[in-house]
Regions:
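Short alpha-helix
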Residues: 288, 318-331
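Conserved SAM-binding strand-loop segment of SAM-dependent methyltransferases
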Residues: 161-174
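Class I S-adenosyl-L-methionine-dependent methyltransferase module
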Residues: 6, 10-158, 200-271
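A short glycine-rich, Lys/Arg-flanked "PGG" loop and its adjoining helix->strand segment in the class I
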Residues: 283-298
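Acceptor-substrate binding/catalytic loop of class I
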Residues: 70-79, 272-283, 306, 310-321
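A short acidic, Gly/Pro-enriched loop at the edge of an enzyme's catalytic core
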Residues: 176-188, 196
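Conserved S-adenosyl-L-methionine
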Residues: 332-342
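Core SAM-dependent methyltransferase catalytic element
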Residues: 297, 349-361
């Protein structure tokens, strides 16, 4: 959507993750008074410094008490050390005291974007916890981020500023709830693929900070809007496999995984979900592609960037090829699978294809 807006092309976006929608809305809001943002930034910094001056930053017990005040259940104490967390909380309070509306959202987004750098969280590519950072220059990180945002906002043209870019929170499997049928010329997406990645973890701190997900139940609500791509995102009521159960190529994959599980004597709860995950993934993608077909204009195209996978008992899953079969069954024509790049597996010493699948209505 950002590229579309830069090119003057109207766009819509749908995402299941509350924070990703919030982030997109901030990045696409270019009707901003930069002078007012600069002035508000100075007021926020002054308010922050006044509050920080009243804290004994060497009193570890006092810092711990401040850090734990109103701590969300989902914010594990290992994720961010007490001192940086207290600074983040002071900065958020300063933003809330000095701003409102769209201006406030912009500054809260700036804080969200510095959470990972000042925290102990790391990605490799999965969610992990690194060496604790006892302190971090939160204020400088915030100042630098806002200054960068202002530089970008001052560079846009009036045409770019006026170009429509709408991002909605929703489930792509119900796309016609948000987008009119036969209204879209081109769709571009990089959906989940069956690699056992739990996608809410990639924005866990941000979801907690913004209050979108503060406990297991609220995270589960978000995950249920997502395509099933992880064994931690499978539910009893899932039933979309019915859309693809008669596709022999998918059954070959699940049969091979099942055979290897039995051969290895696999008994863990997650391993028992492997084949269900594959069925629900391709079923969910079938539901999504069906909806995409409805909103595309005749001759319109959808482009999907997906990776192959070896995540389940080393069985090779050719994601783009299988989705091509699914798409053609739904009525798409002129399918193409184009190699985007070869990428290194993060858990094994080999390369995987990352392909672009192009389908036409």
């Amino acid at each position: 959507q950002l590229v579309c807006k830069l090119k003057g092309i109207p766009s819509y976006g749908i995402d299941a993750n509350n924070f990703m929608v919030f982030a997109a809305q901030q990045k696409l809001n270019w009707n901003v008074n930069c002078d007012a943002i600069e002035a508000a930034k100075q007021h926020i910094i002054a308010t922050y410094l006044a509050a920080a001056a009243g804290i004994d930053w060497d009193d570890r017990d006092h810092l711990a008490a401040l850090a734990n005040t109103d701590r969300p259940a989902a914010l594990d104490c290992r994720y961010i050390s007490d001192k940086p967390l207290v600074k983040i909380k002071l900065l958020k309070a300063a933003v809330e005291a000095q701003t409102e509306g769209a201006e406030r959202d912009l500054f809260l987004f700036a804080i969200s974007s510095i959470l990972v750098p000042v925290s102990n969280v790391k990605y490799g590519p999965g969610f992990g916890i690194g060496k604790p950072k006892e302190d971090a220059d939160v204020l400088q990180a915030f100042r630098d981020k806002v200054n960068m945002m202002l530089t970008d906002l001052r560079s846009v043209t009036d045409v770019q500023r006026r170009t429509l870019a709408t991002t909605l929170l929703g489930d792509s499997r119900s796309l016609t709830d948000y987008v009119a049928e036969n209204s879209i010329s081109l769709m571009i997406t990089s959906p989940p693929y069956p690699g056992d990645h739990e996608y809410t973890k990639h924005s866990k701190l941000e979801l907690i900070f913004q209050g979108y997900a503060t406990d297991l139940a609220s995270f589960r609500t978000i995950k249920k809007r997502m395509i099933r791509g992880s064994t931690t995102n499978i539910y009893k009521e899932d039933h979309e496999r019915a859309l693809v159960e008669d596709i022999a190529e998918i059954r070959q994959i699940t049969d091979l995984i099942d055979a290897r599980l039995k051969s290895d004597g696999a008994t863990s709860g997650f391993e028992k979900l492997y084949t269900k995950l594959i069925w629900e993934y391709f079923g969910g993608m079938a539901a999504t592609l069906r909806e995409c077909y409805r909103v595309l204009r005749p001759g319109g195209k959808i482009s999907l960037l997906v990776s192959d996978s070896h995540a389940f008992k080393m069985v090779h899953i050719q994601t783009a090829e299988l989705l091509r079969i699914v798409g053609e069954r739904l009525g798409y024509v002129n399918a193409e699978v184009v190699l985007w790049q070869m990428k290194n597996s993060t858990s094994h010493k080999y390369q995987l294809r990352e392909n672009i699948l192009i389908l036409e209505k």
